Amino acid sequence: MVHLLAIGQYMQSHVLSIVIALLVSYGIGFLWHGPLFGKLWMEYNKITPPKKEDRKFSMMLPGLTANLVQVIVLSAVLGRTFEIVALAHVGHALLIATILWLPFTGLTIVNSYAWEGRKPGHMALDAGYYLVSFLAIAAVLYVTL
């Protein structure tokens, strides 16, 4: 219970850090699912890009909202963890983010995609996105501690 209160206090005192982490996460998402791997990601997900006149911002709102919640929770938990362990340098922040990503996101994606019969490339693309995002958020939180 004490740590839940501490996470809440962290969120209140580090609003700017969380907002920066959110913006960085959105930036990575737009690059990853756009110019870097957008065509491949759409191919894996069997998505036909809508015509330019049919594209609406509202189509992205569910995903953006889910990402908002994820980044707020991840930032609060990572930030509080960083306070507890008193990090010596950014490498420790990146290591902790990787350790948390591996069982809770990376392997969850692998297990889910394996059962769904998805291609290994699809698995790697999505798991890689989350790893890069976790690492970027960890770096932002470390720099703004």
Segments and roles (model prediction):
Residues 2-145:
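Juxtamembrane/disordered regions of integral membrane proteins
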